Amino acid sequence: MYDFIAYRIPNQNPVKKVGKFKTFKDFDKGFVISNFDQSKTYTFESNELSFEQEFIPHFLSNEPHCISKETYLNFGNELLELLKSNQVQKVVLSRIKKTSFNSQLMIERFEKLCTAYPKAFVYLISSTHAGTWIGATPETLIRSIHTHGFSMALAGTKDKKNQNSWSPKEYDEQQWVSDYILETLQLGGQKEIEQQG
């Protein structure tokens, strides 16, 4: 079986490729995926096969642990108490909900995301190493122009109809993201960093 990538850079045409993700140490350019702690990193090497004819999504054999709605709500109540007592400042609670779907519609879903979000980076990645992922994000992780790199700290969402100003909580959340990106760049050896906004 082959690995697959499909991605669309904002306001450009989608790219769809068949190939293999391979482990690497250094690279000049390419499509890269990594696990959360960066202990496993892969770069994509494409071939000339047809994406649409060859696409069979990969699924990992180790399913994530799913909790019940009741357990999730109990965790939520415990976290609310921690927030009220200022023992924690920021918490993101999520749960995995298992549902069935037709995996052969993945390409169609990718194309719908491209149409719905023309200014977002849209991706469909299917790898024996990571499983299958699909999504769209407006956030620019890294963009380079000549010898300069640019990143974006983006936190919080707001309804287009709600034109009220941001709350102190939303400003704090934005600052946490900005601080994290800055710290990560500094740990990576970046010395000259200019912040705006």
Where does each model-flagged region fall?
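Intrinsically disordered, low-complexity boundary segments flanking structured domains
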Residues: 20-23, 78-79, 108-112
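Contiguous alpha-helical scaffold segments within structured protein domains
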Residues: 51-70, 74-77, 100-101, 152-197
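Divalent metal-dependent hydrolysis catalytic cores, especially in the metallo-beta-lactamase
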Residues: 91-93
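An anion-binding catalytic pocket shared by soluble metabolic enzymes
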Residues: 1-12, 26, 95, 100-176
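An N-terminal, globular interaction/scaffold subdomain
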Residues: 11-54
